[in-house]
Structures are given as C-alpha cells and as structure tokens.
Amino acid sequence: MKRTSLLIALVLTAFSVSAQDIQLPAPQKNAEMTLYQALQNRASNRSFSSAPISDQILSDLLWAAEGINREDGRLTAPTAMNTQEIRLYVCREDGAYEYIAKENKLLKVSGKDLRADVAGSQAGVANAPLFLVISCDLNRYSRKNDHSRVMGAVDVGYVSQNICLACVALGLSTVPRAGMNQEVLRKELGLAEDHLLLINHPVGYKK
C-alpha cells in the first residue's frame, strides 16, 4: 500500500512539473521590417511598460535569438564548430524557463520570479515583463580552457545581437547587460560553475 501511494505521488509530481512547461506557438517569420531598418532603429532602452508579451511574440523572439532554421538542427546564431553550447532562459513573473529550441517549448526550471535578481544593482529595469538570460555550457567543449571560454563569449554575443535586432522588428525594446546576481541565478536555474552567465536582456515595450 505504501509503495503504491509513493508511486502515485511520484507520478503526480512529475505531471505537475511537466504541466507547467509551455508549448510555444510556431514562430512567425514574416516581419515586415528589413534588416537594415532594424539596424537603423536599434537602440538600448531601460524603461519598460507593464504590458505583457504574448506567447506568440515570445516564440518569434526566441526563434530569432537561437531557434532552429535548418533541417539538420542548426541554429539562427552560429556557434564555434557547431558546438551549440548556448543556453537561453526566460525569467518572468510566473517563474524561469529554459528555451528548448528543438521542441519550441519552455521547460520550467524555477517557480520563482527572478527578475529582480537578473536586474541586480540596476533595479530600474526589474519591471520589464521578462528577462532573457544567456549562458554558455563549457561542458559542450572537448576541452575547458581559456580558448573555449573566449569562443563561448563570442557565441553569446551572436545570440545577444539577434535578440537586439529581433526586438526592433517585433516592436519591443531591450538592452544587453552583464550585471546580475549570479549566485542566486545559478542556484535557481540549476547551473554549475562551468556554465558561464554572461549577458541578460530585459525585454518589453518601451515606456
């Protein structure tokens, strides 16, 4: 009886966690703005309205940042030797999620609102509807050394630029930032020391 109850509890727990994952709608790739218009209009912004960002807009943004754009699983952002070592997290009021590009879904990793922790010392940006946090998983490299750290930092930069330009095309605002409470984020996102937390983006509509 006790064993049966334990199995039922485990199943219910697993279902509860998976039920909190979010299947995103298919990204729409028909933005009217040209690349050169996006480059012309790109600007950093740190003041955001409280207007929510729909799952459709979020899906479009995440695909542009680091989505799959070829049948062989390669991404919109290049990575050294196609290592695909970049991890992208969405932090918003209802918790924190990892973007799973292959399934176009958000995998819930924390139920806490971590936006203030991502904002760090710049509390003024903490009111953004969401933050995108970009990390580099050094375990994807055959060797973890200074060279792999440099390559990882460069690859994070590609994703950051994609986010900047996609935000313009989608009518959103953002700013790339390095400051954040790394200790809290590592704990809540489940990241070890060999995951580099390098850049985050508050994202929202301009106030």
Where are the regions a protein language model picked out?
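Positively charged n-region of N-terminal signal peptides that target proteins for export
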Residues: 1-4
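Short, linear, compositionally biased motifs with a strong N-terminal bias
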Residues: 10-11
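N-terminal signal peptide c-region/cleavage motif recognized by signal peptidases
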Residues: 14-16
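N-terminal amphipathic, basic helical "cap/leader" segment at the start of enzyme domains
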Residues: 20-128
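Generic beta-structure capping elements
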Residues: 27, 135-137, 204-206
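Small-aliphatic-rich amphipathic alpha-helix that forms the alpha element of a beta-alpha
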Residues: 42, 61, 88, 130-141, ...
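Short coil/turn connectors at secondary-structure junctions
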Residues: 126-129, 194-196
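A glycine-rich helix N-cap at a beta->alpha junction
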Residues: 190-207
